[in-house]
Amino acid sequence: QSQLEAVFAAVNNLSAQTDPNFKAPVATDADKIVTSIPEQLAREIAATQMATPEGFNVHPKLSPQLAKRVESLNDASIDWSTGEMLAFGSLLKEGRPIRLAGQDARRGTFSNRHAVIVDKENGNEWTPLRALISDENQFFVVDSLLSEYAAMGFEYGYSVEREEALVLWEGQFGDF
């Protein structure tokens, strides 16, 4: 009990140790950071969207959206979901594990992501970007329950334990 009280007193009596006038340093080499990917890699990533497994039944309204991702590379009309797909795919190709969680993360809040596609006939699932990696455990997109603190707490803990991974939690639109 005395140790607990001593720790409480030490934490409770902390003095301010940061300068309220602190200014973050300005990055001077920002223009030297290369964030682009080669066109061939972009095309390889986009091609996963049309590599439907044999016997898999993609919903007829979804097929054109997936095809548009591939076509958008030809006319430079890349939308948000295609850009996200290219970013995730390029990170996977570099060997970086990715975990994305949120109440509607697999489909995307506005029906835009489609990271996991469900067969309309039998409910089987297909995760197109997993075609880029040999270990499917390197890419997880999961729908979590609508419990922000619990979901964020788990994802935070996951990110601490797996520092090399890109761990994201996506809040559901309108829930805040």
Label every PLM stretch briefly:
Residues 1-176:
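Flexible, glycine-rich loop/tail regions that form catalytic "lids" or insertion modules at the edges
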